[in-house]
């Protein structure tokens, strides 16, 4: 995913169901940061606690998105307490919901000090769409647009600013603090604020530890590992795709790479990159990129190429 800032973010979506937990854990080995999605009504579920334990073990920084604010859910302050209690991490809200359910009005951005108004059923949100710029929380435009919810918003923000210190990106990177965002993923609402912050604070592709040494992303020699294998990804064909995370150097289409387990060279003429259900052939890939490789059964999870 290419952002206007020129940064490329590779997002790996994983299932939240506990029956598919193993697939999620494997994917966590290939990422440098994590976005945990929490249901506003259900709160922190058992599977979320387990995922957080893995993130803590791997020192992976975490951002939390509290979802489904367009439905009735738990009180936002109650959710923050639950996150800290069950996930054992300090949290810091960077956006704040204005009511919820059928009365959901939008979110207040504590960093930018603006309000994004919510329009039910609208799924396309631009960076300046429905954005309400306010001079401060005393701005009368809040009373005009939010009606009685303006007073509650002022009280909530005053409480938040009194409880929480300034947000520290260093604490986020160290896994000490998790920034929290609110919204509705189904309506693509509140996601822009999350991703804008994510591109500013998330770590670049990091080093990877192997059995013999630590691989740095700036090394010229190519290296990568298989973290997932998916069979029959295309229902029209009997295919088998191995997903490879590039750790260092440059992956190139048709170039021979050593499969370290078999000690044999492998070439890949149709390496793919994926965007949801769409896929396209790529000629090269760099550290942090994920490439799909057609596999005849020779590759296994954990295999390395160099």
Regions inferred by a protein language model and the residue ranges of each:
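Structural and coupling elements of P-loop NTPases
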Residues: 1-306
